[in-house]
Amino acid sequence: MRSTEEKIKRKVISVVIIVAILSTMAGCGKSQSRKEPITLTIWHVYGGQTDSPLNNLIDEFNGTEGKKEGIKIQVGMVSNTNTIHEEVLKAANKDPGAAKLPDLFISYPKTVLAMNDSDILADYHDYFSENELKDFIPEFLGEGEIDGRLLVFPVAKSTEILFVNKTIFDRFSADTGASMEQLATWEDLFDLSDTYYEWSDAQTPDVEDDGKSMLVHDYHFNYFQVGVESLGTDFFNGDKIVYDTSEFGQVWEPYARAAIEGGIWLNEGYATEPLRTGESIVSVASSASVLYYEDIVTYSDNRSEPIEIIARPVPVFKNGGKLVMQRGAGICLTKSEPEREEAAAKFVKWLTEPEKNVQFVTSVGYMPVTEKAFKLLPEAINNLTNEKYKSLYQAFIDTQNEYTFYCAPQMDSYLDSEMKFEKNIRMKLTSARKRYMNNEADIETLVWDTFQEFSDSME
């Protein structure tokens, strides 16, 4: 009997020991599988180090989705695109003293093209399904495709927008009958610039030839590039600009005429400056520059007055398509461990969810990147309190509905071509303007002589 009881006791003890061992093993397993949060670094351009809409969203992510997923985003640098371009290349090339490349950084494709080895970047195709990518504006994705790999992912885009000092334009309109609708085509805008020059000159009858330029364009290169392409002809042949087409001539003639007659601002600097001083009243600039358009004009004699700035889609040629340059950097993902890359991709997905993306872009003056997010803009506009921003986002909606976004070609010589074009065209037209003011030649001769001089200078 005792033997039986002892056997039962031994069995019970054995079971208890086994259960205890298994429980301990299970506890150890849990401890081993629990991971520390993955901390990812990012360099970006949206705001300042201490005052940034993206930093605020990153804090939100870290406290919600990131907390749930065990992901923490840490901001390493907030600067401008040029600085980040330089720092990324130093890090990528492992220059002495360079910082470590962050997990995520904001970049233009030109930065990737300038890398010695772009294989250090992850392909977003590995983390976004084709079904997920269908939600994005195709042209925005296309700009970030390099050699078949999606290396620069769109999170916020800008485009070119026409900004108008409506306050002064209304005075001009009241005196001349000019209409805001005349700003819809390049032909009408250039004609109107001649009228504006004469009108502004007449405001000070005691001072001769002090008319003002109506238009300032931040990107003369883009005007020609998009203009020629909108007329159905290639602007580039390989990496060379094609000048000897009728379409280039069509884009050149009204532009050069207006510039030589004084209707286009040709000085250096950004378009915001002549609008701030009243030297011009219409500008074509990046939509992101809305941050720098002031609601007050300060004239050269120190007089100032409040003004209303409105935004409109850029003009087009009457017989051309509605084409507009897309702008704005994207976000690059540095290769590391699969877990880190996947965590970074989750943050990018979160930031580009329609509601979140609209929240982000409307705080920085950019466009959203998906079709669904664009559909949310009308409601978002109603929540904006700044009339200038309301006007900008309505212009975004009109642009997205009516225009095709143009993606500049990805080639090593693109930036050099752009810089040389901008410098030479301002220089040649400024020279022609002086000759015109000195009555050295008639306008027709100057338009086409200057074309020849300019095209020769680009060889």
Descriptions of predicted regions:
Residues 147-155, 160, 187-241, 280:
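Extracytoplasmic/periplasmic solute-binding protein
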Residues 36-48, 70-77, 103-104, 215:
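Short, well-ordered beta-strand elements
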Residues 125-136, 178-182, 207-208, 213-215, ...:
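Short, solvent-exposed loop/beta-turn-alpha elements that line the ligand-binding surface or hinge
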Residues 105-161, 190-192, 205-209, 304-315, ...:
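Hinge/lid segment of periplasmic solute-binding proteins
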